[in-house]
UniProtKB/Swiss-Prot annotation:
It catalyses: (2R)-2,3-dihydroxy-3-methylbutanoate = 3-methyl-2-oxobutanoate + H2O; (2R,3R)-2,3-dihydroxy-3-methylpentanoate = (S)-3-methyl-2-oxopentanoate + H2O. GO terms for cellular component: cytosol. This is Dihydroxy-acid dehydratase. The active site is at 520 (proton acceptor). The lineage of its organism: Bacteria, Pseudomonadati, Pseudomonadota, Betaproteobacteria, Neisseriales.
Length: 619
């Protein structure tokens, strides 16, 4: 029987000093002996996805205390990728994932907490907390802040009278010379109307949905709007449930509630299957690989490639399809509706267990909104957007009169009526990316699934943006942005501005982009990232010359620099001959702080999840 970790600091004569300090935090005499549950919040006023979380930690804490445990809240950092986008701030985004994981490990282990509630929401916070959960392997539950409502705008030129939109529209239209300043301002003012993670299937929402598929959060976690009063119940339920599973582990020796027991290889395959089916962000591949690595699960790019070939795309939302947003996914039954359709097609391992059900099969049946007997599920997924600008959680209670149960033409479809039989994400291999690169196929127009073009080589995102806005890129070009990987950046910047600007120039279906960096969850188009090995690690993307021909073949999962093996070997030898200047950008002036240099010294390429490899500095 495992012993409560907290006894280390709450029991024994020698811990009198520690108990004195616990008392100073509000712990009463009768509390000693109760489990201590850490509540890791990520509230910040910098991020709309986190601005409403200031009271959420205490909401969970009070419920934990009612259930018979001690709750202690602390905070971790949260970076807004959208605000950090397009300048040097983006260098810090991915490294913050590891900093978040470390900070949670430090707090939980330093204070001997018995269990953990993770209150996350945006891009790197959920992955960072997942890494921490796997590392600590104590009872853990995730509850996120929820998605933002989609924006609405009326009267923008050359479109229907009213449309829904998101921050990506603001980025694209700001660079379109055909749209006036007034029209851009109107989009800007309406794109992000409420608190919450951005309204499409971008990275934040993709990751929060994946916590459901992994079995570490409650149904609705990924889709229940931040503004809806009903979401409050998820926080209260998380508070009650963490006490229950904590006692099951420490008092009944039930190891099935531990993160590593839940997030098995089967669970990772389920999560990736669901991700492919909903056309999630390519960042999810990076993060799932990192989380699996921390969990000690043998889940690799080859597994993702295998799944991507057999899983159809059955849910297609913004940025891949502007007919649907997260609020529509919720109305259609949320993540468990997607899981149900995948299960019907035999695409899931439903014998895995979750924190809230003995098996995934049980959970799918319980939360099936097509079953009229599941009134609790039907009521939860009728939650609708309020349509009022706000930064307040639980501020509206609007409900849909009906759910979207149309599995032929609705938001979520059955496999027979899939948006495409090819999944929403794919892994490509070839001489330019021997260990793979990734593309969100759900966002690629069918006309360019096969594409051959001329390489236009840039050694920084900034230079690429300057080239695109300076009209140096024409139809048929393939923009190569290298030395932007985890080590080469360092920090693996997102390339949302280059892809957005290609669209604003009318080149969204006429050009491709390949990088060893990564993309925002808001990216669509023929945007291929995570080229591994990265240029700074000796990857062949560093050997591409201006004007080379590159062939992309998504149906056959290949990408190729059209030169002979002998020529490629000669270029590699020439590069190696540069000595200390080899595998470094030739003409880039970029300040890199000590913190970023430390990350870059340990960073691995994207095919390994861009995790830190301490051995690289120990050698």
């Amino acid at each position: 029987m495992p012993e409560y970790r907290s006894k280390t600091s709450t029991h024994g004569r020698n811990m009198a000093g520690a108990r004195a300090l616990w008392r100073a935090t509000g712990v009463m005499e009768t509390d000693f002996g109760k489990p201590i549950i850490a509540v890791a919040n990520s509230f910040t006023q910098f991020v709309p996805g986190h601005v409403h979380l200031h009271n959420m930690g205490q909401l969970v804490a009070r419920e934990i205390e009612k259930a018979g445990a001690i709750a202690k809240e602390f905070n971790t950092i949260a970076i807004d990728d959208g605000i950090a986008m397009g300048h040097s701030g983006m260098l810090y985004s991915l490294p913050s994932r590891d900093l978040i994981a470390d900070s949670i490990e430090y707090m939980v282990n330093a204070h001997c907490a018995d269990a953990l509630v993770c209150i996350s929401n945006c891009d790197k916070i959920t992955p960072g907390m997942l890494i921490a959960a796997m590392r600590l392997n104590i009872p853990t539950i995730f509850v996120s802040g929820g998605p933002m409502e989609a924006g609405k705008v009326i009267g923008v030129a050359n479109i229907q009278p009213e449309r829904r939109l998101d921050l990506i529209d603001a980025m694209i239209e700001s660079a379109d010379d055909n749209i006036s300043n007034r029209q851009v301002e109107e989009v800007e003012q309406n794109a992000c109307p409420t608190c919450g993670s951005c309204s499409g299937m971008f990275t934040a929402n993709s990751m929060n949905c994946l916590t459901e598929a992994l079995g570490l959060s409650l149904p609705g976690n990924g889709s229940y709007l931040a503004t809806h009063v009903g979401r409050k119940e998820l926080f209260l339920e998380a508070g009650r449930m963490i006490v229950e599973i904590t006692k099951r582990y420490y008092e009944q020796n039930d190891e099935t509630v531990l993160p590593r027991s839940i997030a098995t290889k089967k669970a990772f395959e389920n999560a990736m299957t669901m991700d492919i089916a909903m056309g999630g962000s390519t960042n999810t591949i990076l993060h799932l690989l990192a989380v699996a690595n921390e969990a000690g699960v043998d889940f690799k790019m080859a597994d993702i490639d295998r799944l991507s070939r057999v899983v159809p795309c059955i849910c297609k939302t913004a940025p891949n399809n502007h007919d649907y947003y997260m609020e529509d996914v919720h109305r259609a039954g949320g993540i468990f509706a997607i899981l149900k359709e995948l299960d019907k097609a035999g695409k899931l391992h439903t014998d895995v267990h979750t924190i809230h059900a003995p098996t995934l099969k049980d959970a799918i049946e319980k939360w099936d909104v097509t079953n009229p007997e599941n009134t609790h599920a039907i009521e939860r997924f009728k939650a609708a957007p309020g349509g009022v600008r706000t930064t307040q959680a639980f501020s509206q209670n609007r409900m849909w009169k009906t759910l979207d149960l149309d599995r032929e033409k609705g938001c979520i479809r059955d496999v027979a009526h899939a948006y495409s039989q090819d999944g929403g994400l794919a892994v490509l291999f070839g001489n330019i990316a021997e260990r793979g690169c990734v593309v969100k196929t759900a966002g690629v127009d069918e006309s360019i699934l096969k594409f051959t073009g001329r390489a236009r080589v840039f050694e920084s995102q900034e230079d690429a943006v300057e080239g695109i806005l300076g009209n140096q890129i024409v139809a048929g070009d393939i923009v190569i942005i290298r030395y932007e990987g985890p080590k080469g950046g360092p920090g693996m910047q997102e390339m949302l501005y280059p892809t957005s600007y290609l669209k604003s120039k009318g080149l969204g279906k006429a050009c491709a982009l390949l990088t060893d960096g990564r993309f925002s969850g808001g990216t669509s188009g023929l945007s291929i990232g995570h080229a591994s090995p990265e240029a700074a690690e000796g990857g062949a993307i560093g050997l591409v010359h201006e004007g080379d021909t590159v062939e992309i073949d998504i149906p056959n999962r290949s990408i190729r620099l059209v030169i002979s093996d002998e020529e490629l070997a000669a270029r590699r030898a020439e590069m190696e001959a540069r000595g200390s200047k080899a595998w470094k950008p030739e003409n880039r002036d970029r300040y890199v702080s000590a913190a970023l240099r430390a990350y870059g010294a340990m960073a691995t390429s994207a095919d390994k999840g861009a995790v830190r490899d301490v051995a690289q500095i120990e050698r």
